[in-house]
Regions:
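Bacterial N-terminal signal peptides
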Residues: 5-15
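Extracytoplasmic/secreted proteins, especially bacterial periplasmic and envelope-associated proteins
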Residues: 40, 51, 55, 110, ...
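Active-site rim elements
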Residues: 43-46, 157-159, 231-238
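Catalytic beta-strand/loop cores that center a nucleophilic Ser/Cys/Thr
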Residues: 61, 65-67, 156-224
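A glycine-rich, often tryptophan-bearing local segment used as a flexible ligand/cofactor-contacting loop or short
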Residues: 104-174
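Extracellular ligand-binding/catalytic regions of CAZymes and related secreted enzymes
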Residues: 23-35, 62, 92, 206-211, ...
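Helical hinge/lid and interdomain linker segments adjacent to catalytic or ligand-binding clefts
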Residues: 30, 37-41, 49-127, 131-133
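Boundary at the C-terminal end of the N-terminal hydrophobic targeting segment
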Residues: 18-22
Length: 256
């Protein structure tokens, strides 16, 4: 009888410890309120989007109470129009949209406006790496206004120091004084749009110019968080980068 009581006590203690650990993990999350719904749109040229999607969603879900839906369509070329946007309510089920796609040569203005009009009406977004070169051949500026930056080219791959200069912004909380990226591409920023605010920069090894690499933007009534880094698998393995994306997503959704 005594042995049964001891076993039961040990069992209860283990369960209490497990519950306490779970609660501790929840408290450490950047956001642990009502579960957010996020849509990740990915696909296109030049990147390992299958790996990136897994690293991004699993990494952010550890830090934020969020559930991802992933749409990877359009193939691996530079030109595509995905059927998602044919539905005018394509973004309605989601609290925030993550763009990590690469379709530089898609130029149809009506197609592009199907995307940007939804964001301008208030749907928050996170934009990563080649999203900045997506639709770059288009004549209209709608996508670039949405991003908050204009970029048409990048420099060589290197390990670039990232220097924060908006340290008081909640997205940058806990960001290292100088984070050095894994091998990644530095995007040349030709223009910062009026409603965008840089949060960190890197310096070109070729020209010595500073280029914004992390920023926020207001597009219509939507919050947009962006970073030009995210080319390599190694970047998506870096906990500093995943934490940055998690904080950026939470901020865009007005939960930070």
């Amino acid at each position: 009888m005594l042995s049964r009581i001891i076993i039961l006590a040990v069992f209860l203690n283990l369960n209490v410890s497990a519950l306490a650990n779970d609660a501790q993990k929840e408290n450490k999350k950047i956001y642990s309120g009502e579960k957010l719904k996020a849509l990740l749109i990915t696909g296109g040229c030049c990147h390992n989007y299958i790996f990136q999607s897994t690293a991004l969603t699993s990494g952010i879900e550890e830090k934020v109470n969020v559930e991802f839906t992933v749409i990877n369509e359009g193939g691996t070329g530079t030109k595509a129009q995905i059927p998602l946007y044919d539905d005018p309510d394509w973004a309605k089920p989601y609290d925030v949209i993550v763009h990590n796609e690469c379709f530089a040569n898609t130029v149809d203005p009506e197609y592009i406006k199907k995307i940007t009009s939804v964001h301008e009406a208030g749907k928050p977004a996170v934009v990563i790496h080649c999203a900045m070169h997506t639709y770059r051949a288009a004549k209209i500026d709608d996508w670039r206004r949405f991003l908050g930056v204009t970029s048409r080219r990048h420099e060589h791959k290197a390990e670039y120091p990232v220097i924060p200069f908006a340290k008081d912004h909640p997205i940058m909380k806990g960001f290292p004084e100088k984070w050095v990226t894994p091998k990644d591409e530095l995007y040349v920023i030709d223009k910062l749009w009026p409603n965008s605010k840089p949060l960190a920069y890197s310096v070109s090894e070729r020209t010595g110019k500073k280029h914004a690499v992390i920023w926020i933007n207001t597009f219509g009534s939507a919050r947009v968080f962006g970073t030009t880094y995210g080319h390599s698998d190694e970047t998506f393995k870096d906990p500093v980068f995943i934490d940055l994306l998690a904080r950026g997503l939470t901020w865009a959704a007005s939960k930070l």
